[in-house]
Amino acid sequence: MFNSFGNIFRLTSFGESHGPGVGGVIDGFPAGIKIDMDFVQQELNRRRPGQSLLTTSRKEPDTVEFLSGIFEGKSTGCPIGFVVWNKNQHSNDYENIKNLFRPSHADYTYMQKYGIRDYRGGGRSSARETISRVVAGALAKLALKQLGISVTAYTSQVGPVKLDKDYKSYNLDLIETNDVRCPDPEKAKEMAELIWKIKGEGDTIGGVVSCVIKGCPIGLGQPVFGKLHAALGNAMLSINAVKGFSYGQGFDSMELKGSEQNDVFYNNNGRVETKSNYSGGIQGGISNGQDIYFRVAFKPVATILMEQHTVNINGTDTTMKAKGRHDACVLPRAVPIVEAMAAMTILDYYLIDRTTQL
C-alpha cells in the first residue's frame, strides 16, 4: 500500500478506525517553525466526530500527542512523529456485517486485493485515517502563514442546495459560525435542514467543498508531469468519498468562447495581474500569483441505515442493514481535510520550487 504523500514535505500515515490509534511521521518540515499546539488541536476539533447533531455520534477527544521533531515549541528539522489514540470504538456494531460486503464501500476490493480485511469501521479505508492529514496540514498551515499564504475551504453545496456566487461574494469569516461550515447563513440553514431530514430517513447525501488559496507566489508547479493543479487534484481525490475535482472554471469553461474565457493581463502599478481568473490561479501547470480556487465533489456516505441487497464472503446473495454511528453527510467535517491536503501540497511545491534555481 502507498501510505506516504508528498515529495519534500512528506507525510506517512498509519492506523485504523478501530485499532489503538492513528498517526503519522512527517519528513521535510522546515526547522525553526513555531508550533502553535492550540491551533493544531483546533484543526483536529474541526474534523472531530460528535461535534454537532449533524455528524456521527462517535465521541472522540482526538487529542494529538507529538513524539518527536519538536523542541521548546519549535520544529527541529527532524522527523515529526505523532499519534492520536482511539478512545470510543464500538466494534460490536460491525459483528452483524463482518461476513458481508457493504455496497459502495472498500470491503470487496480490499478482500480481493489483500485476501484479508478489517471489517471494524472499514479499518484502513475509514475516514478516521484523515486525522493524520489534518495534523500534517495544520503544521503546513503554520509554515505557510509565515509566507503570507492562507488556505480556506467551505461547504458550497449539499445535495440540491448550493451557493450561486463565487467565494469573493461571501464573508469567509462566517464559515465557522454554523455547523455546516457555509459562509451564507441562509443557505447554511437550508443545508442543515436537508441533512437532518436525510439523517432521519436513515439515508445519506453528498455535496461540494470549495477552497481558495490566497497569497500563493508565482512559479509553483512544473510544466509537464508536476503541474500544480494535477498535484492538488491528486491530493483531493485521495480523500475518502471524493468523486470529482474541478479548478478555476472547470467544466463550466466548456460553455465559453476563448474571447470570453481568456484571463487578460494588465499592469497594476507595476504588478502584472489578470482582469479575470477563469484559470483558477494556475496557467501551464504553474501558479500565476492570482487566487487559486477549486471545488471538490463528495459522494453520499456509503453506510446507510436502510436494508440493501449484497453478497456475503462466499458470493451468496443476501441483504444487510447497517447499524452504529455514521455521518449522514461528510461535508462539514470534510472542510478541514480539504484545507489540510491543499496546505500540504502548496508547502511541498513551495519547497520544490526552492530547488529550481541556484
From Swiss-Prot:
Pathway linked to the protein: Metabolic intermediate biosynthesis; chorismate biosynthesis; chorismate from D-erythrose 4-phosphate and phosphoenolpyruvate: step 7/7
Reaction catalysed by this enzyme: 5-O-(1-carboxyvinyl)-3-phosphoshikimate = chorismate + phosphate
Binding positions for FMN per the UniProt entry: 124-126, 240-241, 284, 299-303, 325
Top-level EC class as recorded in UniProt: lyase
Residues that, per the record, bind NADP(+): 47
PROSITE patterns reported for this sequence: CHORISMATE_SYNTHASE_1 (PS00787), CHORISMATE_SYNTHASE_2 (PS00788)
GO molecular function, one term: chorismate synthase activity
InterPro entries listed in its UniProt record: Chorismate_synth, Chorismate_synth_AroC_sf, Chorismate_synthase_CS
Gene Ontology cellular component list: cytosol
GO biological-process terms attached to the record: amino acid biosynthetic process; aromatic amino acid family biosynthetic process; chorismate biosynthetic process
Listed CDD domains: Chorismate_synthase
Cross-referenced Pfam families: Chorismate_synt
Domain of life: Bacteria
Named cofactor requirement(s): FMNH2
Sequence similarity: Belongs to the chorismate synthase family.
HAMAP family: Chorismate_synth
Protein's name according to its UniProt entry: Chorismate synthase
Gene encoding the protein: aroC
